[in-house]
UniProtKB/Swiss-Prot annotation:
GO molecular-function terms, A-Z: ABC-type vitamin B12 transporter activity; catalytic activity
Alphabetized Gene3D superfamilies for the sequence: 3.40.50.880, P-loop containing nucleotide triphosphate hydrolases
SUPFAM superfamilies: Class I glutamine amidotransferase-like, P-loop containing nucleoside triphosphate hydrolases
Taxonomic source organism: Prochlorococcus marinus subsp. pastoris (strain CCMP1986 / NIES-2087 / MED4)
Free-text function comment from the UniProt entry: Catalyzes amidations at positions B, D, E, and G on adenosylcobyrinic A,C-diamide. NH(2) groups are provided by glutamine, and one molecule of ATP is hydrogenolyzed for each amidation.
Protein name according to UniProt: Cobyric acid synthase
Pathway(s) per entry: Cofactor biosynthesis; adenosylcobalamin biosynthesis
Record keywords, A-Z: Cobalamin biosynthesis, Glutamine amidotransferase
Highest taxon of the lineage: Bacteria
GO biological process, one term: cobalamin biosynthetic process
InterPro entries attached to this UniProt entry: Class_I_gatase-like (IPR029062), CobQ/CobB/MinD/ParA_Nub-bd_dom (IPR002586), CobQ_GATase1 (IPR033949), CobQ_synth (IPR004459), GATase_3 (IPR011698), P-loop_NTPase (IPR027417)
Active-site residues per Swiss-Prot or TrEMBL entry: C343, H451
Domain GATase cobBQ-type per the UniProt entry, residue ranges: 262-459
Amino acid sequence: MELIEKLQPIKKPLMVLGTSSGAGKSLTVTAIGRILKNSGEEPIPFKGQNMSNNAWVDWNGGEMAFSQALQAFACGIIPSSEMNPILLKPQGNSTSEVIHLGKSKGITTAKDYYKDWFFPGWGVIKKSLNSIYERYPNCRLIIEGAGSPVEMNLIHRDLTNLRVAKYLNANCILVTDIERGGVFAQIIGTLELMKPDERKLIKGILINRFRGDLSLFEEGKKWIENKTKIPVLGIIPWLDDKFPPEDSLDLLEKKSSLTNPELKVGIIKLPSISNFSDFDPLENEESILIKWVMESQNLNQYDFLIIPGSKQTIKDQKFLRDSGLSEDIKNYSTNKGNIFGICGGLQMLGTILEDPFFKEGSKINCEKSINGIGLLPLKTTFFQKKITRQINSESIWPQVTEINGFEIHNGVTELDNSQDTFKIKPIFKDLDLGWYKENIQGGTIAGTYIHGIFENDDWRDHYLNLIRKGKNLPLLKKRTRSYKMKRENIIDNLANEFKKNFNISSLLN
């Protein structure tokens, strides 16, 4: 299904393709964006289609992948869903929610998606590209591919790799991860499967995550260049990046080097976990060790627990119930435990979840109603309408301070008047954004709909100090660097490493 029309931007777009998923495409685009921004250019990130439950909400309430939002920050611009016009949010059982230009278009199976959604998807991608170039006529687009560009069973319906490269006549770089092994076969195999006109677009090869002495790979570099007639433009050393991973499989590979933490945080690894970027500010705290909880266990080793967001809340609550974790969490709460739920995690902390329209899944695989963990007297009902919006509010607990973040959820949560609601109190001035309850035994149970809550430095410090006080630890003092400043520093360091080890100038012509 060849589409040969082409767009002709003023500045040559760059495209980052990979030999596989996890090769380093996202970080490469992030680094290039910051390098070009610092050089005075106007870079704009773009990924035609992304599959991720790690999402962001733009200024217009549109959903987009968090990785493209992060790339926009690196480029020094405000994220917009046009930078990621198609977002697929996996729901399990080979189904995904389809997001076009930030808005949900429904749920489909993988088979039906490839059959029915190709032309609408390509139209959305072209519309987004035209819109970006109308708004930023002198920009340089930095495009990210997805997975491998040569999945031969899907290539005729691949919306986001070589089709985009040919449409824009982009200068492409092929990135491969040497740490996983098989780098020579990955490079040669990928190039051999391309058509001649596609292979001509590949202007360079980038070796990512090299450990050890770079000089030891000099012969390998020469072999690749002699075999492919394409220059190896860079060898990036292994970097201890602190960015949140793009999917939940990579999530478990993140290792902490912290050996003597002051606080130990347990995060429940839900089967349908979403928005795990919520915990990036905690990962960047020097005194906190994060552990992922995946099975029933004694939770008293943790100073506080987090129940994260979920793409399928009822299904994940069923997992907590059937695995025994729901009972473990209740037992933890009676031992001065501190528990915090975000979005779906807040819903699960309540007494009941009802899904009259089966918004949480199919009628076969999903329960219409299920009891929650029961630690907060809250009832959640899932309706047809999905709420996506940015939040600017003010907290009243644990301290009065300004709050920013965003909401992405189905479901409306309200007090369950069949329960004792006397002890539950609102966290924010906008009363429906979150609640908390202090345990008689000590500790607090709290939850919010606000994603990005821990990015709010003052709020995070006061919440952590509440826990530190209960552990007789010294309270945190007012910090000199915000989380967002740390994130900017991480992006700068990433860009500096790429600039030292990657000849980007040859791609700009």
